[in-house]
Regions:
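Extracytosolic ligand-binding ectodomains
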Residues: 1-180
Length: 180
């Protein structure tokens, strides 16, 4: 990463996009700070998994991060209620905040429950057809499948690491409907 960041420092781009896994995100933020690389915008992947705001605090401030879910989104359902309730319940049960993978897995169970109920059967064709006809909202987001099986009704979330003193948090900045 150091060689790439040396080039970034010399070229002075307007945006640096870092995509990789957890270790790569942590390494990038650490080395950007150590090497005093100044870019107007840093966009990254894997910020949630890397716990970027907690691991690197102010060094990660203003990093823009794509994610599948954030607890502050206002989607609702009858089982988990909303993201904040899900977050509190999950944290109480497991001792840590839920990553988006836990949230999407919980939402998937709601989708299957709904499909089984609508199919009123365990017949695989009836269940498959019920899944294909899914159009519902969960605490995780809207669920509606395209012909190819993709959920086409839930946007990605973009958050930015924001710090107030030494406390750094992920704040949703897009979609603007949920910007904090």
């Amino acid at each position: 990463m150091a060689a790439t960041l040396a080039k970034v420092k010399a070229v002075k781009p307007d945006v640096l996009v870092v995509s990789g896994h957890t270790k790569g995100a942590l390494t990038a933020v650490r080395q950007i700070a150590e090497m005093k690389v100044d870019v107007p915008m840093l966009a990254m992947t894997h910020c949630d998994a890397a716990k970027l705001s907690k691991q690197h605090g102010k060094n990660s401030q203003y990093a823009l991060c794509a994610s599948q879910w954030h607890k502050t989104l206002t989607y609702k359902d009858d089982f988990f209620k909303d993201g904040m309730t899900y977050d509190a319940d999950f944290t109480k049960e497991f001792g840590y905040a839920p990553p988006y993978q836990a949230a999407e897995s919980s939402a998937a169970l709601l989708v299957f429950k709904d499909a089984f109920e609508r199919a009123n059967s365990f017949d695989k064709v009836k269940v498959r057809d019920a899944l294909a006809d899914t159009n519902m909202q969960t605490f995780y987001g809207n669920i509606k499948f395209a012909e190819g099986g993709q959920n086409v009704d839930k946007p990605m979330v973009l958050f930015q690491v924001m710090c107030d003193g030494d406390k750094c948090e992920n704040k949703v900045v897009a979609p603007t409907k949920w910007a904090s």
